[in-house]
Amino acid sequence: MSTLVCQAVAAPVWSNGARTRRIRDADGEYRCTQCDMGFDSMTMARPVNHCCDGIMIDEYNLYDDDPIMHLVDSKTPIKRGSQETEGDGMAAEAIKVTGAEPVNCFMVGTIKCKINENSIVAKGVMAAIPRQLTQDEVFMRKARLQAAVAKSTIEREEKERQFAFSKLEEKLRARREKLKDGIVIKTRKGLEWREATPNQQRGKLQSTSFDASGGKTLTPHTIYCKTKSSKFSNGGVKCATSKKMRTVRKPQSLKMKTESIDVLIEQVMTIAGKHAKQVTLIDKQKTNRVWIRRVNGVRLLQVETKHHKGIISQKDASLNNLTKRVARHFARKTAYIHPSDSITHGHSGVVFLRANISGSKSYSIDDLFVVRGKRNGKLMESRNKVAWRKMFQIDHFSIVGIKIWNAFDAEYVKLRDESVSDHDCVGGITPEECGILAAQILRVFYPCWRITCTKCISNWLSKPTSEQIEHIYERGNLAIQDLNKRIPSAHHVTQMVELLRQRIKNTTFDMGNNTKVHELIGHRQDGVFRHLNRLNNSILAANGSSTIEWESMNESLLELARWHNKRTESIASGGISSFRNKISAKAQINFALMCDNQLDTNGNFVWGERGYHAKRFFSEFFTKIDPKDGYSHHTVRATPTGVRHLAIGNLIIPGDLQKLREKLEGVSITAVGISEKCVSRRNGDFVYPCSCVTSENGKPVLSDVILPTRNHLVIGNTGDPKLVDLPKTETGRMWIAKEGYCYINIFFAMLVNVSEKDAKDFTKFVRDEIMPQLGKWPTMMDVATACYKLAIIYPDVRDAQLPRILVDHSEQIFHVIDSYGSMTTGYHILKAGTVSQLISFAHGALLGEMKMYRVGGTQKMEINMCCCQRKNLLIKQLIRAIYRPKLLTEIIETEPFVLMLAIVSPSILKAMFRSGTFNQAIKFYMHRSKPTAQTLAFLEALSERVSRSRVLSEQFNIIDGALKELKSLANMSMRTQHTYPIVQNQLDIMIERVSADAELLRDGFVVSKGRVQALIEKKLSRRPEKFLHRLAICTTIATNYVIFKSEAWFWRIVRKQRLELFQGSMDGAFELIFGRRQTDHPLGAHKVAADVSKWW
């Protein structure tokens, strides 16, 4: 600003009108245009680069070193740029604002001056200086000029700010609308927008309403400050702002102890060895691929070497520190000394401890020894660098495959013909697939275990030609199937093998089967036999065909003819006499017992984790046998309806051969022939697995003495049984199933086929879900249903073989034979041999008596022995549960038939109705068992009818009238609970008593039972009150409240119904006496109803 003032006062000009400036003074210094200080550089001479105090007053009028405007004549042509013109215009405007007036008339910049007519300035001569200003004029002009410049600067900056913020406002308007309903929070990653919670939105609304209530709007405004007169504003100064630095958080390093690292190494390598996987060990950008290898029964680490990859180098391998640590971890576990002769092909890369190898060996750099091969009988270390000539003398222990490939490649190239095709060969089959093709073809024509074995070659050549042809035919079929699945593009090989198979097989077949078919059904031309004879004649006419399907067609035709012949005979007879159910001569195959991974070195089944989880069966459903007491306690196995003699006593072997032969004679029962009890039908056809086994003549096959074994699980119902060692227990004692739980051996046999990972869930499910539902001596239908449930959850158990199951038709019992055999003979044998066949008993469409047989016997004897005791105990438990919700819930969920024992007393029925017991039970079984829910609904209706009656004899009559219907509903419900037979027995007793009383009354006798019923009811009615008084105060209050509410609701309904009944009776009486209805009588229904309501 001071510069503009100086420019307005005086300026040197040249004659041509151009502005000039003294760059340096006489002393050669640069001068400041404000304070006239001298500097050595032009940069420091600028006012902004030093503490400039401005020009002094005394120096102002004498200052002539500034670049000032030229005063030019009007006739002098001036060529100026647009920027210079604009600057002169601003200076002129500033002079006009300050009110400065030049002498006579002159212009600044392009303004013409007419001081004289002639040119006032010659070339290189300064123009005349205007008159000297006083101190006050200079101060006033400075102040006005400063204010004008400040005002124009503020206006320009305001316009720029508004322009900049208008653009920013447009960009941020959409974002501000989006963020209106949310909040911006600061997180570790920066600022984030989140949707505002209801409380935050409420706070924003309150703050908005508070601002609106004031009626004031805050707008940005500018505050101007007056500066001192001795200072001049040079505009804003750019200031540096602080920048938020990103904080880099270093991840915490994981530190493990040596023991933890060893455990980690052991677990990782164990998993890798179990699944035959390779592990890559990385340490400081050096990697080693390793795996587990057993050498002489010891687990050691094997490292991938260069000659594994087909690279022969002087130094075969290198180990990083981590690999060395893992190798030492495995090598130090054993002190076994490995002879050098036992280390052979396949052991290259195995890491031993050098001290654990005996024999000739090369040196090693540390205590480890990595096998490479042998040279002159000496073991070579892979990490040692060998000479070039010695490298090819080493017999590497894994280079056999490379030798085969090199020989094959060289021979194939030598034998192939020159290419005469018109195309370029393109590789479409990988070398690995070529190796598979060569192996398959070699296996078809050359079935040797090792291709280098001369003994295998001799054995193959010694076989007859027919066996060799048969092998090529069968093996070729397997090769075709394998190649079609693995290498679909190898159709040229499969086509040639198939062509060879068709040629080597004899195209003719034996016509003996056709002759047998003609002998069987040739004379019959009715129905389907006419078509069968036509098919037989067509086959005879097509003899000599080259396809193999004709032979299978002959065999199928023969079986079809036999089946139709037998079926026709059976339908014609229409009886059981034609039933044949021969047992298979071959034992069924159980693949779980054939898997090598589940067998030990002796071929015995290895339970693994299954044996550990099988303890749940032993602890709950088995009893220990103490050999010290002898086996006499277990020789006779009692059942509820009889006994069965076990062969456990035969484990004691006498020295006398005669006595030993006597033990082979069993205890025979009465033999029973084949009848309808022995068969099961579905849709009119026999279901053979659910029927008894017969011989070829139709007679039943009877069981013989079954020899015992010690600590074995005997499975297999046909053929020779299979013995599986029971899981080893801590005590090592013998176990026998508890009475009524002999069917646990079926689930034990299913455990063999369950995988180890599912063994825990399987045993828990059987113990906690299946066994409580079945209980003691369940029916075969219930056992089959449980097996069906397990087969859905664990599909592997469908093929599980069953123990031998014997059938006793006289007592309607199934005996599941365990390892202690049976001395009792004469039982029928059930044909079902697998779980899937046993599940057929669960079908509702299956007809036959055997599905209702008990597995172990019925419960009649047990019920008769302690019927009264158990019934009284259950009634007492039921009364206690009326006012105890937890006990009541347990009874409802486990034994719902206990609720039916409430029919022994009307007071128990009324108490259960008032407490809502039946309603709770109905809700529980509504979607679980509809028959059970219907039975409970009938009990609720019966208890309501009993509650409405006030007379004891009438209440008993209501109960007696509903007994038959209640029994029919109970028969349709689930019968797997333990209390079902007790309830059924109580119902039978009450029904027989009612029928006997009715016969006595019909014959004219008087039945006096009122006093007995009153005494029983008096005794039972006190028990609910007695148990109610024993409850806690809070429980008593809650129970009384529930009873009060239910009684109030019930008597409100009863009172209304009785009132309606009484009004109906009164209407009939009024109409009969007065000839009109009581509503027309002065003593209307309102008064009568009011009086009656008072009475009731």
Swiss-Prot record:
Enzyme Commission (EC) number: 3.4.21.-, 3.4.22.45
Primary enzyme class: hydrolase
Active site (UniProt): H307 (for p1 proteinase activity), D316 (for p1 proteinase activity), S348 (for p1 proteinase activity), C742 (for helper component proteinase activity), H815 (for helper component proteinase activity)
Post-translational modification: Potyviral RNA is expressed as two polyproteins which undergo post-translational proteolytic processing. Genome polyprotein is processed by NIa-pro, P1 and HC-pro proteinases resulting in the production of at least ten individual proteins. P3N-PIPO is cleaved by P1 and HC-pro proteinases resulting in the production of three individual proteins. The P1 proteinase and the HC-pro cleave only their respective C-termini autocatalytically.
Residue ranges of the motif Involved in interaction with stylet and aphid transmission: 450-453
UniProt keyword terms in alphabetical order: Host cell junction, Host-virus interaction, Hydrolase, Inhibition of host innate immune response by virus, Protease, Serine protease, Suppressor of RNA silencing, Transport, Viral immunoevasion, Viral movement protein
Gene Ontology cellular component annotations, sorted alphabetically: host cell plasmodesma
Motif (Involved in virions binding and aphid transmission): 708-710
A Gene Ontology biological process term: transport of virus in host, cell to cell
Gene3D superfamilies: Helper component proteinase
Residue intervals of the Peptidase S30 domain: 255-397
Pfam families: Peptidase_C6, Peptidase_S30, Potyvirid-P3
Ranges where the Peptidase C6 domain occurs: 734-856
UniProt superkingdom: Viruses
InterPro entries: HC-pro, HC_PRO_CPD_dom, HC_PRO_CPD_sf, Pept_S30_P1_potyvir, Potyvirid-P3
Site (Cleavage): F397, S398, G856, G857
A GO molecular function held by the record: serine-type peptidase activity
Family, per entry: Belongs to the potyviridae P3N-PIPO polyprotein family.
Domain notes for this protein: The N-terminus of helper component proteinase is involved in interaction with stylets. The central part is involved in interaction with virions and the C-terminus is involved in cell-to cell movement of the virus.
Descriptive protein name: P3N-PIPO polyprotein
